[in-house]
């Protein structure tokens, strides 16, 4: 008897006991169809997690609570927003939503309980053509039957600054770590940096860059949901992604935001209490999502993402043992946390689920005594204690006195160099500080954003004023179809 059979030939699916196994996950062997069902059921369970979400996703009929017309309107108005990044998670989540719509249409004779609007955010025009091409392929290959139920929208997040009615300059005072805000409406003396790229260019490290980009993207998505009356935003975050988010928030000094960021029960109060946020993939590991993505052919639509083949019986990556050459110094905090969870995901996946469950159990922090809860002018998170007071208490601001002639000479050189810079600049950090001290007003930044602002080249950033005018300023979108070029 020949021993030349591949490993997959001798492995049978433990669910159906018929087909060859293509995935091994949680110590169980799955064929492709059974694994798709396994992942799909976990997502659908989250979609039915409480009455609010059941009313969105179920097909409604006339009953004791609603008339036939009311049921029809509820089905029609059950709109959900799906952010698509073209990573594996958001593609898989959308694929399962598409399957759900197809099943509802067949079972309920053309009726469905909800519609899907997909939002794709970008700030780099170079990637725009690739996005359009992928969307066109997706519609034709995957979503042709649901082209009236699934719509794709492209949003340029540079509008974050372009369409903001009021801009402010947030400036960090180095001596006391207080934040001052300068209204730029009538301050033509200060250059307005209106594009996102200009703001991101001020970031001194990749962590700050990614944090700001993530916030602007999330704000654009939630603002779009607010303006178009969506019932819920479905975020394609895996259990692994949520775990690394929890750890990263703690490391960045944003631990107080964990409770609100994982909250799926309450309406989003920063956006008019109009919608809720749901994480349908929160019970699924990233490696499981990647396996689903590959076996379903969704890997052909990925942008800037590499599939992990850890759970696949037949590996797809030839250099699985290749050592990553990226320096730890060049990694963001989120990337470091993600790398850790990727390493332990195989043998210690319970650690990941424990982190997410613990984050879910965290309640909103209590405010510091005699401190009125406020909101951060930058990230909009609640502030429960005065960060500047705490930073000042642990910081030594007085320098060592100059003693030797060499120290005095070096100090004079430094002073002359900076004076020359001051003369050649219309409004650099030193002048801006003095100007803001006299003309600015006190602003509120959380601890995490205070630390972030400290990494900026001039300790300041131009930022929109988050108010009703900004929230209602129209966010333009471009509807993508199956014949985009």
Curated annotation (Swiss-Prot):
Cross-referenced InterPro entries: CTU2 (IPR019407), Rossmann-like_a/b/a_fold (IPR014729)
UniProt main location, coarse: cytoplasm
Pathway linked to the protein: tRNA modification; 5-methoxycarbonylmethyl-2-thiouridine-tRNA biosynthesis
A GO cellular component entry from the record: cytosol
GO terms classed as biological process: invasive growth in response to glucose limitation; protein urmylation; pseudohyphal growth; tRNA thio-modification; tRNA wobble position uridine thiolation; tRNA wobble uridine modification
Keyword annotations: Cytoplasm, tRNA processing
Compartment(s) where it occurs, according to its Swiss-Prot or TrEMBL record: Cytoplasm
Gene Ontology molecular-function annotations: nucleotidyltransferase activity; sulfurtransferase activity; tRNA binding
Gene3D superfamilies (UniProt xref): HUPs
Function: Plays a central role in 2-thiolation of mcm(5)S(2)U at tRNA wobble positions of tRNA(Lys), tRNA(Glu) and tRNA(Gln). May act by forming a heterodimer with NCS6 that ligates sulfur from thiocarboxylated URM1 onto the uridine of tRNAs at wobble position. Prior mcm(5) tRNA modification by the elongator complex is required for 2-thiolation. May also be involved in protein urmylation.
UniProt-listed PANTHER family: CYTOPLASMIC TRNA 2-THIOLATION PROTEIN 2
Family note: Belongs to the CTU2/NCS2 family.
Protein name, as recorded: Cytoplasmic tRNA 2-thiolation protein 2
């Amino acid at each position: 008897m020949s021993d030349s059979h591949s490993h997959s030939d001798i492995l049978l699916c433990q669910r159906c006991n018929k087909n060859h196994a293509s995935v091994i996950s949680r110590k169980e062997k799955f064929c492709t169809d059974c694994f798709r069902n396994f992942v799909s059921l976990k997502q659908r369970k989250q979609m039915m997690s409480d009455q609010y979400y059941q009313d969105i996703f179920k097909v409604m009929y006339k009953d004791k609570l609603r008339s036939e017309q009311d049921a029809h309107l509820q089905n029609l108005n059950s709109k959900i927003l799906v952010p698509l990044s073209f990573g594996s998670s958001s593609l898989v989540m959308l694929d399962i939503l598409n399957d759900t719509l197809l099943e509802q249409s067949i079972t309920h004779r053309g009726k469905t309980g909800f519609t899907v609007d997909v939002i794709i955010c970008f700030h780099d025009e170079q990637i725009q053509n690739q996005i359009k091409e992928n969307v066109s392929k997706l519609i034709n290959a995957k979503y042709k039957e649901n082209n009236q139920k699934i719509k794709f929208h492209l949003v340029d997040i540079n509008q974050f600054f372009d369409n903001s009615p009021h801009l402010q300059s947030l400036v960090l005072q180095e001596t006391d770590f207080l934040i001052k805000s300068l209204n730029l409406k009538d301050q033509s003396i200060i250059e307005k940096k209106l594009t996102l790229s200009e703001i991101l260019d001020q970031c001194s490290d990749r962590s700050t860059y990614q944090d700001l980009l993530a916030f602007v993207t999330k704000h654009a998505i939630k603002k779009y949901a607010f303006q178009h009356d969506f019932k819920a935003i479905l975020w394609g975050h895996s259990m692994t992604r949520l775990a690394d988010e929890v750890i990263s928030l703690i490391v960045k000094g944003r631990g107080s935001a964990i409770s609100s960021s994982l909250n799926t029960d309450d309406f989003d109060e920063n956006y008019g209490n109009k919608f809720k946020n749901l994480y349908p993939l929160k019970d699924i590991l990233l490696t499981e999502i990647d396996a689903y993505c590959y076996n379903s052919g969704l890997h052909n639509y990925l942008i800037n993402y590499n599939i992990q083949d850890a759970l696949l019986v037949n590996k797809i990556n030839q250099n699985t043992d290749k050592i990553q050459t990226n320096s730890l110094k060049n990694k963001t905090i989120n990337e470091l946390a993600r790398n850790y969870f990727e390493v332990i995901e195989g043998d210690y996946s319970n650690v990941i689920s424990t982190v997410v469950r613990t984050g879910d159990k965290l309640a909103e922090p209590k405010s510091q005594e005699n401190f009125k809860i406020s909101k951060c002018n930058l990230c909009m998170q609640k502030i429960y204690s005065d960060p500047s007071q705490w930073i000042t208490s642990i910081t030594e601001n007085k320098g060592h006195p100059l003693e030797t002639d060499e120290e005095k000479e070096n100090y004079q050189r430094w002073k002359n160099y900076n004076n020359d810079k001051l003369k050649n600049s219309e409004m650099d950090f030193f002048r801006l500080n003095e100007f803001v001290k006299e003309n600015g007003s006190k602003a509120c930044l959380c601890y995490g954003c205070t630390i972030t602002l400290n990494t900026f080249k001039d300790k300041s950033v131009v930022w929109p004023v988050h108010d009703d005018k900004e929230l209602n300023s129209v966010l333009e979108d471009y509807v993508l179809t199956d014949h985009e070029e």
